[in-house]
Amino acid sequence: MQLQEIAQKLGCPYEGDPTLEIHGVASLAEARPGELSFLSEARYLPLLEQTQASAVIVEESLVLPRPIACLRGKDPRLLFAQAIELFYQPYRLPVGIHPTAVIDPSVELGEGVAIGPHVVVMEGVKIGDYTQIHPNVTIYPHVRVGSRCQLFANCVIHERTEIGDDCLIHSGAVIGDDGFGHIPLPDGSWRRMLQAGRVVLEDGVEVGSNTTIDRAAVGETRIGRGTKIDNLVQIGHGVKTGSHCLIVAQVGIAGSTQLGHHVILAGQCGLAGHLHIGDGVRVAAQTGVTSDVPAGQTVAGYPHQPIAEWRRSMAVQRHLPELQRALRKLEARVAKLEQNGGR
């Protein structure tokens, strides 16, 4: 594809030979001649000196240290994401039902649905138009799957789950399994509490590989529109998220906690149950959230605190050994003064 064609498809200006042939995309460090890369920030300019890329996507006003063909835009990373789609198309199953799939006669399939090898779809399921069900997926009874969804290999969708349009469920994810509900008995044992609720994924939700979203005991576990969930995340029963949240790998959210809109949970943070996290909250990696967080705050640490306070605490913590030595010296001096009657 020529440089001018790429610029036209992306709707951005370009500099350099309009007929320059581009056949792929790569990072600045790994690009080879004929490939397109991008530069998101000026601090990466040294990489531009060394790259073999034939063209780069850069910010509108960035001054380049050497002549190189380029595309310019306000958000180079977004343009690069769009450029990737010009050169790479993810695998799609052929439309139709593979002969090894087991489909209950009551299942309702929309137009252009693809169902791969060894898929099991149980009674009362409805699947929307152009949705793809990849190999070894199991869909339990009375599930609703919207249009243009992708359910990748080996994921499991439990009974009564509702999945909106344009959702991605990656390999190994489990949606709608029993919530973790157990009642202590007088003899010290535990009585399992049946989970009679369901999970709802609104439109445009993405669920990463080996993530689990448990169904509520009663009512719903609900993931808001456009929310993106990374791999290896555990979302407990009755959790509700607002729209367009971002939940990074290895996060755990205990039951009945509610997230507002546009909340970001960084990797390995944990949220206790029955909390309310306000709109726009950001939680730093490995933070332990133990109480409600007001809208707009950025928190870190365990237990969580405003990130500015946490940074000050960390600055002091690095000096604890020398502070301890100084304290011991002061204690020794005070003890000596007391022995000498204050002299």
Swiss-Prot record:
Pathway: Bacterial outer membrane biogenesis; LPS lipid A biosynthesis. GO terms for cellular component: carboxysome; membrane. One of its GO terms (biological process) is lipid A biosynthetic process. Keywords: Acyltransferase, Lipid A biosynthesis, Lipid biosynthesis, Lipid metabolism, Repeat, Transferase. The active site is at residue 237. GO terms for molecular function: N-acyltransferase activity; structural constituent of carboxysome shell. It comes from the Bacteria. Its EC number is 2.3.1.191. It catalyses: a UDP-3-O-[(3R)-3-hydroxyacyl]-alpha-D-glucosamine + a (3R)-hydroxyacyl-[ACP] = a UDP-2-N,3-O-bis[(3R)-3-hydroxyacyl]-alpha-D-glucosamine + holo-[ACP] + H(+). InterPro entries: Hexapep, LpxD, Trimer_LpxA-like_sf, UDP_GlcNAc_AcTrfase_non-rep. Pfam families: Hexapep (PF00132), LpxD (PF04613). Catalyzes the N-acylation of UDP-3-O-acylglucosamine using 3-hydroxyacyl-ACP as the acyl donor. Is involved in the biosynthesis of lipid A, a phosphorylated glycolipid that anchors the lipopolysaccharide to the outer membrane of the cell. Homotrimer. HAMAP family: LpxD (MF_00523). NCBIfam families: lipid_A_lpxD, PRK00892.1. Belongs to the transferase hexapeptide repeat family. LpxD subfamily. This is UDP-3-O-acylglucosamine N-acyltransferase.
